[in-house]
């Protein structure tokens, strides 16, 4: 048959590529300059770009769409191969640079980042936080653990029956004076170490949290280094290890379970920076044992950075798709005009309100870890130095510093990881059916991400743990007239905004909503009044009755920290021409992520007027979205995430969403393979004989006639 114009319609297909380029050309500023703000400095920005390019060009570390088709076993093997490769980089660069490399790996291949992080982060941080200088030097340097060589550690805290309640762990470490050894034992199934990353196949050693028992007395949970495998990688006697199996995500991590059956370790394998046990069985406890839990805080700080890099990646995909995707012709377009374009998804106000809030937090986040380690608040590894002296003032200063970081890191970790999980799914939904395709990145990102909401502190439990000291501080101010220091010093304004001043409104008008510093003040007042309300309940009942309020306080504290830090950074940023755009983003964050979500709190405690909250939805948020809209592509470009890091067919830089998507689908699922591997089953179903044939016609009329004679 010859095709002619009479029987074939030829029309121009969609051209999303030109849409994104048009927006890029109309940008008001250079995304690279914005990236300097995002990363905190020109030097850091250039370093991150160089590290990303290095891994893109590395044939082993490079990741593409085939990543989404890997089985569990393939993920495990590939992860091990990548760790072997990454270890070579560790040999040649500083730990600070290597940590930045890991933060990038955590975006595009989080299971690789986690498996390395368990060794360098959790295992070594436990030794750094709980071991002596000599112990740290031995395990980290002499045994080359810090170079990902010789020893590969895992972190043995959680058990099958205990997670959040660390003090309730039941693995035992009983001191044997005669042999000068500890006997590590799993007394029952509930004490089985569980979810231990790296235990199933990789780890040679484990930092085990176990109950110290000397002469029959239980001294609580301490930490011990326990060898799991020998130099041939065979299990040590008495050590039983198993694989937990498939998980919701991060199957490249060999999470395992461990049981110890009277495993003996030398006394000096106990980490003894704080608690010490002599050969005679004398136990020396530290002045304040809270310091021994500082090892976990570093991971929480880095998870904040992970959260916002993931937010940047997910919002980049959804926003680039929303620019190229068109659906429905607007009312101002002739529906019969064949050349009239449909409306870009990005131009629908609802779409803007759904997506715009998620690319704002990444603008303030990369500096958070370094900010939490400023000279005024030294790294957690330095807090224990005052213990070498006997000055009570210095000891309590260390405790105050750690408590302050606990509040900040805990509130930020829980709030940021929750926001990350929410953002991934909202961005997926905003991409319609195509968001459901693995090749567009959302599915694996979500499955890999949500564990962040429960590990290293379950977010609800962590939220309550953060809210509790805030309420206690309010009680100490209210009942004892004490003064609070640190990041919650604003609680000292208690009398100014409670009692006879409890009706003092902070946000009265749209102008108030439009001033970030006024919003920050409103958050402080909301925290003060909510804390006082919770305190009144606690005095009558207990903290168990205010769990929801404590979590709310934790979230508000996180937003207070981020907005305060964001404004501080804008004020000190030397690219002043970008300040108006950054301030607009800050206003959008305050309006959507804070005020809109916590409107009930602000209204209940008279922090905001009804008029202000009404104007928030009808005036402020639509206005800010309209201001942000022209530069959406530039904002996503400012994250400087390459196509490899984004790893999404519909999220590539060129914006050619349909061609890229279709090409990847065909590459990974060749259309030349017209029959499925299970085609025999399908054909057997379709071509099966009739029921009469399968019954050999034994029930036919002819058979009946024969058998009835």
Swiss-Prot record:
It is found in: Peroxisome. One of its GO terms (molecular function) is acyl-CoA oxidase activity. Residues 1-29 are annotated as: Disordered. The gene is POX4. It comes from Candida tropicalis (Yeast). Keywords: FAD, Fatty acid metabolism, Flavoprotein, Lipid metabolism, Oxidoreductase, Peroxisome. Its cofactor is FAD. Gene3D superfamilies: Acyl-CoA dehydrogenase/oxidase, N-terminal domain, Butyryl-CoA Dehydrogenase, subunit A, domain 2, Butyryl-CoA Dehydrogenase, subunit A, domain 3. It catalyses: a 2,3-saturated acyl-CoA + O2 = a (2E)-enoyl-CoA + H2O2. GO terms for biological process: fatty acid beta-oxidation using acyl-CoA oxidase; lipid homeostasis. Belongs to the acyl-CoA oxidase family. This is Acyl-coenzyme A oxidase 4. One of its GO terms (cellular component) is peroxisome. The lineage of its organism: Eukaryota, Fungi, Dikarya, Ascomycota, Saccharomycotina.
